[in-house]
Each structure stands twice: as structure tokens, then as C-alpha cells.
Amino acid sequence: MIPRISRNAVKEGFDTLPAAICYFDRNGLLRLINHRMQEIAAVLCGRDLQTLTDLEQALRSPGGGVRLRDEAARIYEFPDGTVYHFTVRPVQDKYGIPYTEVMAT
């Protein structure tokens, strides 16, 4: 018998990933975000992240002392000297429901 994993265990594992990651639904609403991405988004956007549009606008015109180092490669330097490469890609869950995944590594 395969043991069931609780939602809390999944979220805890998601929060401890070394990459910053979040998922938006087909309407662009934030559905899942880990702690690292929350921290990055707060600096980049100046507030809590709510929508994909908010993040896209912040990536086009970063705030909080964030510097765009390479627009084509989506590489940003944060005030603490940390450099992140952002990727955006469509994904689907096991039911075929589409989401947008954003990662910063």
C-alpha cells in the first residue's frame, strides 16, 4: 500500500526547494508559490504577488533596486548581489488543466 502524502507535507517540500517557483492558473491568478519566490517577488514587485500580469510588469520594469542584466535571457541582479534567471513555461496537471510555471534559479 502506498502511503498518502498530506497537503502540508507537499507544501513543506515545495517551500524548501532551492529554486524560487510559482504557478498561475489559466486566468493568471497565483495558485501556488514557495517561500523563496515570495521573497523575490516582494523585492521585484514591491508587494505580495497576486497575478501573472503583476509579475510580467515587474520583470519588464523591475523595482526595488533590481537591475535587468540581460533582457533576452531574463537575468536580473537583486540589491543583495544575487542574480536570478527567470523562466516562464506552460505546464499541465495530471487532469490536463493548464498552468503557467515561473521559476527563478
Listing of model-derived features with the role each one plays in the protein:
Residues 47-81, 85-87:
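Terminal output helix/cap of sensory domains in signal transduction proteins
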Residues 2-32:
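Sensory modules in modular signal-transduction proteins
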Residues 41-45, 86-90, 96-105:
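PAS-family sensory domains
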Residues 79, 91-97:
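Flexible loop/coil segments at beta-strand boundaries within sensory signal-transduction domains
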